[in-house]
């Protein structure tokens, strides 16, 4: 009798555990709920974000990755998207190394792109600073009407990101209403390499390198030492100015600074700190699935009791001394002037509805939410409860059935429309 009770207790416990596991696996927005959010986000981003915050498991930090259950595009970036209409897909180039160990070399030529190692972004006496970048193999500057500066993610693999953009470009050409003409789009990706890449042999003498991922928040150059004052955002300024220069590109209509993941964070950080200029009417930003957001006020959806630094840059604007020198001057109390400029810029956000990976796991990020999709929804939703509100210059796509995947997000129709056209 005792054995029977013990067996029964174990069976009930196992059944309960299995039920919990099934519940965890299924705790996410259903395809129907995600489709509703996708549609609502086009007209009312704040209401759509509030719907996301009703998804089962959205506040659970121990969720299994939703990508394993409901993705419509697999779980990576090594295949064409279902909506490609037969567009050709090119695999990514390769090198040896990782973002932690450093790279042995930079791929030279692939797909429709090549590596340019001759761009001098700054001079100081006899010293020069060169930033290698990837760009179209062939183009006529007089025919270029649009340029996309694609910032890499944490792995610093600009070659991969630009190859994915090239694949997305071919998908865009399959949609006649987008009118993406051949030879009119210049695609390029700067490199933001690490000191460890220099030690492994990937970087040459005068080529700039940074320390770890500091470049994503506006950190300064580590090498060459003559340029230790130069911010990664100064480098982006150089690219933007070059592309908007009528002497070099007489028919340029629009330049877009774009990025996904850490590249998305970089794009947002740059949009927040860059000065507003007369040329900004021709400048746009695309922010895809950043791991955290620059909050526009001091509120946070989760406790900050054990995180007094929660408002520091790049998680907020309220700690003046934490703002990089690049954008500190004239930022105003709590960054008010930078925030005013940010709200005027043309920015498009992309949020994957299966992207429940943690992203940064420090207390400043965790005060914003438990995952990337949770942080995105909280950041959008709080703008409905603040004086800033949702800017008319900002748009957003909530992407169903996609997780933290570079290519499906870049190749999503709404992203293609923003990157390759000026259609509203």
Language-model regions, residue ranges each:
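The feature captures the conserved acid-bearing segment of alpha/beta-hydrolase catalytic domains
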Residues: 280-385
């Amino acid at each position: 009798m005792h054995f029977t009770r013990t067996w029964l207790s174990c069976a009930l416990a196992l059944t309960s555990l299995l039920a919990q596991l099934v519940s965890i696996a299924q705790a996410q927005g259903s395809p129907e709920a995600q489709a509703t959010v996708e549609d609502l986000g086009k007209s009312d981003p704040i209401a759509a974000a509030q719907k996301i915050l009703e998804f089962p498991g959205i506040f659970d930090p121990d969720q299994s990755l939703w990508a394993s259950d409901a993705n419509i595009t697999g779980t990576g970036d090594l295949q064409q998207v279902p909506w490609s209409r037969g567009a050709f897909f090119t695999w990514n180039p390769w090198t040896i190394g990782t973002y932690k160990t450093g790279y042995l070399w930079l791929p030279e030529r692939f797909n429709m792109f090549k590596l340019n190692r001759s761009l001098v972004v700054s001079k100081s006496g006899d010293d020069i600073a060169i930033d290698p970048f990837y760009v179209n193999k062939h183009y006529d500057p007089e025919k270029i009407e649009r340029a996309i500066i694609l910032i890499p993610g944490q792995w610093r693999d600009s070659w991969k990101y630009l190859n994915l953009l090239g694949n997305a470009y071919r998908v865009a050409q399959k949609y006649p209403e987008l009118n993406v003409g051949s030879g009119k789009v210049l695609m390029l990706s700067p490199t933001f390499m690490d000191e460890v890449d220099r030690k492994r042999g990937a970087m040459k003498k005068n080529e700039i390198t940074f320390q770890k991922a500091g470049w994503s928040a506006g950190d300064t150059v580590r090498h060459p030492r003559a340029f230790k004052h130069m911010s990664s955002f100064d480098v982006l300024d150089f690219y933007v100015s070059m592309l908007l220069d009528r002497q070099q590109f007489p028919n340029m209509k629009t330049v877009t600074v774009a990025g996904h993941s850490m590249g998305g964070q970089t794009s947002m950080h740059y949009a927040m700190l860059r000065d507003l200029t007369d040329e900004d009417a021709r400048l746009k930003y695309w922010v895809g699935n950043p791991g955290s957001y620059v909050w526009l006020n001091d509120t946070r959806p989760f406790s900050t009791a054990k995180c007094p630094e929660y408002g520091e840059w790049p998680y907020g604007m309220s700690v003046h001394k934490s703002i990089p020198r690049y954008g500190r001057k004239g930022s105003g109390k709590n960054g008010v002037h930078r925030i005013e400029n940010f709200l005027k810029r043309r920015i498009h956000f992309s949020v994957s509805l299966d992207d429940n990976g943690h992203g940064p796991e420090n207390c400043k990020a965790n005060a914003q939410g438990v995952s990337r999709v949770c942080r995105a929804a909280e950041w959008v939703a709080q703008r409905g409860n603040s004086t800033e509100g949702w800017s008319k210059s900002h748009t957003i796509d909530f992407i169903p059935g996609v997780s933290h995947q570079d290519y499906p997000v870049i190749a999503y129709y709404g992203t293609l429309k923003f990157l390759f056209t000026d259609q509203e």
